[in-house]
Design a protein with these regions (language model features):
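Assembly/oligomerization interface modules of large self-assembling protein complexes
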Residues: 31-100
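Short acidic (Asp/Glu) and glycine-rich catalytic loops that position anionic groups and cofactors
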Residues: 160-162, 306
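A surface/extracellular/periplasmic glyco- and lipid-processing/surface-interacting theme
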Residues: 163, 167-178
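Sequence/fold signature of self-assembling virion shell proteins
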Residues: 215-349
């Protein structure tokens, strides 16, 4: 009976539907900070090359051109992408089957299946949003006993790129302008490009409005006693940042529900992240090939083509004892940082 009810639902349709599910618009980390990329394998690989090119030397006319030296250093890291996913059993199945036997069609069952397919996709993307936040926070992606899996990927981010504010920004007498200027100097010293934007919480951004250094900069005060004490408006804070050529601030306050009923923030509320431009050269969220996708690309009538194998895969099936219909979402994926020293993740309070 189950086979007859589900015979019109193909693996091809389910996967196409799953991959058409839109990512949450607020998921900036996997959306544009470390964007998603599909790779044809199960291993991530990063390659960093640094080349030192010395200045040329003048020579006398008719003298031999000197032979220059060069210094090239290449660091290559690879590892296995970890699997993730989940399985749903269709709820209230007995009620649905009884309704079908009374002459109704299987549309309710089909609708529930596709609802679960969408939920699998969103769940996997939510976990990867948390993973990117984990990597950005301390330079490491860490799993500790998650379904028996323990993994640590260390991107080797220098400690200078993970500073702490000289004085917590919750103190109105702190100097966030001086802090950010120092962090920009750290980036310049390593040859990093100017950050495109700052990613932080509303709470951290709001601290600038009541900060003495920002007020003094806005009003052009030399003596603190002459500085108005009014809280700055957002556009006034932006004016100060523009004056010092500081990158624009983007608010990121995403919270993701966990299966224990709590909410998790991908990024701690106290982090101030300076994000570089050209981010596909900095880091990505890599999706590889799952065992399920390999199975779907084989046989006389494959459900998907080989080039479609990387990414999120959702499969479905049924059994008679006990009577169950299930869907399963799968992926092998994690964030990978290619260049560890062109961003700043600062703790500001």
């Amino acid at each position: 009976m189950l086979e007859a009810l589900l015979r019109d639902i193909t693996a091809t349709e389910i996967i196409a539907f799953a991959r058409a599910v839109q990512t949450e618009a607020s998921y900036a980390l996997t959306g544009n900070v470390m964007p998603e990329r599909q790779i044809n394998g199960v291993k991530y690989k990063t390659r960093r090359t640094s080349r030192r090119v010395n200045a040329a030397k003048y020579r006398a006319y008719d003298a031999q051109t000197p032979i220059a030296s060069r210094e090239v250093k290449q660091i290559e890291t690879e590892g296995q992408l970890p699997p993730l996913g989940q399985k749903y059993l269709v709820g209230e199945l007995e009620t649905i089957l009884l309704a079908v036997r009374r002459g109704q069609d299987a549309s309710e069952l089909v609708e529930m299946l596709f609802d679960d397919v969408a939920a699998h996709t969103k769940s996997i993307r939510s976990r990867l949003e948390l993973a990117v936040g984990d990597l950005l926070t301390d330079g490491k992606f860490t799993l500790t006993g998650e379904n028996g899996l323990t993994v640590e990927y260390d991107a080797q981010v220098p400690s200078a790129n993970m500073p702490t504010a000289a004085t917590p920004w919750t103190d109105p007498t702190s100097d966030p302008i001086a802090d950010e200027m120092a962090w920009l100097e750290t980036l310049r010293a390593s040859g990093a490009p100017m950050p495109e934007k700052v990613l932080t919480s509303y709470q951290a951004r709001a601290l600038l409005s009541g900060n003495d250094a920002y007020r003094a900069a806005y009003y052009g005060s030399v003596n603190p006693s002459n500085t108005p004490t009014a809280t700055l408006a957002p556009n006034e804070v932006d004016a100060v940042r523009a004056r010092y050529n500081l990158p624009p601030v983007e608010i990121y306050d995403v919270q993701i529900p966990k299966d224990d009923g709590t909410m998790a923030r991908p990024l701690p509320v106290d982090r101030w992240i300076m994000v570089p431009p050209n981010r596909t050269q900095w880091g990505e969220t890599q999706y590889g090939i799952t065992a399920e996708s390999i199975a779907l690309t084989t046989g006389d009538n494959p459900a998907i083509e080989l080039e479609e194998a990387p990414g999120i895969i959702v499969t479905h099936g049924w059994q008679d004892d006990p009577v169950q219909v299930w869907t399963k979402g799968s992926a092998v994926a994690m964030p990978v940082l290619y260049v560890p020293d062109i961003h700043i993740t600062a703790k500001v309070f």
